[in-house]
Amino acid sequence: MEISALLERHRHSRQQIGKRLLEFREFSSKQVMWTYEQDEIKLVPSSCKHDERLFEELAFCILAANTSAEMGMKTVDRLRKMLHHASPKQMTTAIKGVYRFINLRPQYIVHSRTYLQQLDVPFHELLRSFEDKQELRDFLANNAGIKGIGYKEASHFLRNVGIGGFAILDKHIVKSMHEFGITPTSKPPSSRRQYLELEQRYVEWAESLGISPEELDLLLWSRKTGKILK
């Protein structure tokens, strides 16, 4: 696909992309949650506490890694009633036939849940305590208490709770960068240094197109799936 065709796709999908980005910001300010309904990921009203909704989103990012946003969302829906108290074994039983990594990811979720529950500060206050969002991402990606979250997943989580400006450098995005001649290789980054270097190229590419990093991510994914995901 030529750059001109990519920009034309953006022109046609700009309204949908803008709506999804607004929903990411609304997630932190309104009583809402994500769900998979009628073959679509939707934002719907929720009675859950703020920290419960934030942890749901963290679990989603753990589950979506190396699978898909839709599989991750369907699995969160299956786990929602037990996410805050169930054992890994109970979660594994619940997601058989729905999810791919039925043993390891529940362990990551429970490990992270236990760590966050033992902190002296609520999850939402912990996130707000970082004045520098780069330091916040470093904390999430490098913290042994939070399993299944690296730089890609931390960037995904922060974007989805309204903290933008990062690149979510999964294999599809990196492959797209290579296809458009932005990088010499389609190999995903394997260290913090590589991630930051590739992220800088991504951000500069978005700026050259006249769109935000968040818009470009959703645009590239819509090119692959035909949908505006999360």
Model-predicted segments: where are they?
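Structure-specific DNA junction-binding interface
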Residues: 1-98
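Short, hydrophobic/amphipathic alpha-helical patches that form generic packing surfaces
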Residues: 57-66, 110-114, 159, 217-225
